[in-house]
Amino acid sequence: MTELKNDRYLRALLRQPVDVTPVWMMRQAGRYLPEYKATRAQAGDFMSLCKNAELACEVTLQPLRRYPLDAAILFSDILTIPDAMGLGLYFEAGEGPRFTAPVTCKADVDKLPIPDPEDELGYVMNAVRTIRRELKGEVPLIGFSGSPWTLATYMVEGGSSKAFTVIKKMMYADPQALHLLLDKLAKSVTLYLNAQIKAGAQSVMIFDTWGGVLTGRDYQQFSLYYMHKIVDGLLRENDGRRVPVTLFTKGGGQWLEAMAETGCDALGLDWTTDIADARRRVGHKVALQGNMDPSMLYAPPARIEDEVATILAGFGQGEGHVFNLGHGIHQDVPPEHAGAFVEAVHRLSAQYHS
């Protein structure tokens, strides 16, 4: 077993005792940091940054040099799998990710390959191995993937969407085609995450960014069902240590009980869910991650500290809480406000772990 100097994050996910509440931030390696912008400029474009193991490692480590974070998260993108399937990923200025060959029908789905994680996605595994080496056992490394539903939204819509009318048309008019796509994606995500674990990821997270746009019935059928399949197929132990799995559906606070039944170790909460209520509902089954509104980081540090105190009190005494934002950090947040947030979590949480 590789020695970890700080295993708070892994212990909290398994609802084991810790000295203080662990904290990390979604998108902690990102554009709010001037050093990230410099490395991104050096890479040339976003996907070149993802595909260069040394540069991906550098931006992964940047926030850890600034803040005493309790975990590192692989620097990558959720759209690596659709890109490896040959959909022609590119980034349009001001538009976000786009695909030159979106999925429009069952025939398109039939043609999609299931990518080999050590071949077409080998650059991700190289990044994982490089980051693990450079972390030198300081903190654990989180691997991740998008959920099948969330990946499918981009693949069918051809990019980002506000209304999701194209994929919902497929969902209601040709559900068989969508289920075939989701099944293929579930197999791809399972292989991809297991390869990340074998390469050195010590915990994995599934980001279901767009599950919250579905009705309850559709969420069960088109999103949660496939995440459950992935959880069932994941390696849960590696290098002599349990590998915790976190599910995060943005806008999914009403479905926590169903999510907790998947066999995952933890659930991510966005800021619209009350953490005290979430703990009452599912805290006996899973750990909880979250859940400060990312926009709170625009506030003065004293106000950030008040919000941290409120969320810690909401979760209350005992184990099973990883502090995080309710979604990714915004790109124009002052870096010192992020530092105040991390410091406040550690300082104010000790009283809950005595």
From Swiss-Prot:
Name this protein carries in UniProt = Uroporphyrinogen decarboxylase
Gene3D superfamilies for the chain? 3.20.20.210
Keywords assigned: Cytoplasm, Decarboxylase, Lyase, Porphyrin biosynthesis
Q: Where is this site: Transition state stabilizer?
A: D77
- Which Gene Ontology terms describe the biological processes this protein takes part in? protoporphyrinogen IX biosynthetic process from glutamate
Keyword Zinc-finger appears in the UniProt entry: no
Lineage summary = Bacteria, Pseudomonadati, Pseudomonadota, Gammaproteobacteria, Enterobacterales
Q: Which gene encodes it?
A: hemE
Cellular component terms (Gene Ontology) = cytosol
* Residues the entry annotates as binding substrate: R27, Q28, A29, G30, R31, D77, Y154, T209, H327
Source species:
Salmonella paratyphi A (strain AKU_12601)
